[in-house]
Amino acid sequence: MPVSYMEINLNALRHNLKVIRAHLPKEVNVLAVVKANAYGHGAKETLRIALEEGYVAAAVARVEEGAELRDAGFTCPIYVLGLPLPEDMPIGVNKDLIMPIDDTVDLDAMEAIAAVSKKTIEVMLPIDTGMNRIGTHPEDVPALLKKLEAYPHIHAYGTFTHMATADHKEKDAALKQLDRFDEAISYMPVDENFVISSANSAGVIDIPRSWHNLARPGIIIYGPQPSDVMTNKLDLQYAMSVVSHVTHVQILHKGEAIGYGGTYVAKEDMKTATVPIGYADGWHRSLSNKGVVLINGKRCPIVGRICMDQFMVACDDEVRPGDEVILMGKQGEEEITVDEVSATAETIPHEIMCDLKRIPRVFVEK
């Protein structure tokens, strides 16, 4: 076992996937958002469980992520959420990925690639209802559909939008976005096979109007709630723990500083322990002098600045080299959640989990 590793509890993932599926009506299909390596949890492992639990598809951010899943043997529909550039299109076509297009995408290039491949490309129509990121504005949908008539190898498979404030307590802005989405849908050739999707994690929990016929939960698959201000919550389990081990202990004498810049000075003689994880592993430097870890079931505060590959904590006299350190997860009666870590780092759980790229993953069933 490596000195530092990330433990992914597959049973927790399965639990969350079951809870989400049970929360939605049977007539609403569900895909698993597994972009960014399933928010750091392992895309292949997460998608395998999702399909076993009745999910019908996967969503990724980029064409290369979808290609990796195809190469791993997955045959389910794979939606790409980000717009493709011409250099992405041959891979997307070859791997049968469902790519999004709006009026900025090079449809001539896409049509040419499809024609050579003798394939019809299924595409999604992203609608910009207020996120102002990608997509066609509702009033421009008729023109886009008219434009598509000139491309016989490109077929509109469905449409989606993204709510910017669905995780807020007040839903007025999200509902206005759904009004705009309804306007866009009214122009489209909707039949029983046309996919309509607007329910992100917060929408899945809180906004039934957003469910349509395909929900796309993301963060809630992995345990965190979309936000701490939402009225409703699901019974979710955190699937990720981060584990390391003490490599060094020492006495820091009164008046001595520790770490780069000497930002922490001992007020009295104290014991410190060194943990071999740093910001290169994704443990945010903003946790310097603020974050905590668990050693022997006790909370130990980070002292000094987090280094590239290590950081130091204050600890009691019982701590020894080799002792287990929990950065996220449970130890004894104590627990540090990703929500606590992200709040301390002044960011969101998504970023904390996605940033932990260098730490090896160990998959367990607990």
Stretches found by the model and what they are:
Residues 18, 146, 350:
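Active-site phosphate/pyrophosphate- and oxyanion-stabilizing loops and adjacent acidic/basic residues
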Residues 23:
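Conserved PLP-enzyme active-site core in the AAT-like
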Residues 1-10, 14, 65, 84-86, ...:
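Active-site anion/phosphate-binding pocket segments in diverse small-molecule metabolic enzymes
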Residues 4-7, 12-15, 28-187, 191-197, ...:
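Active-site-proximal beta-alpha core segment in soluble small-molecule metabolic enzymes
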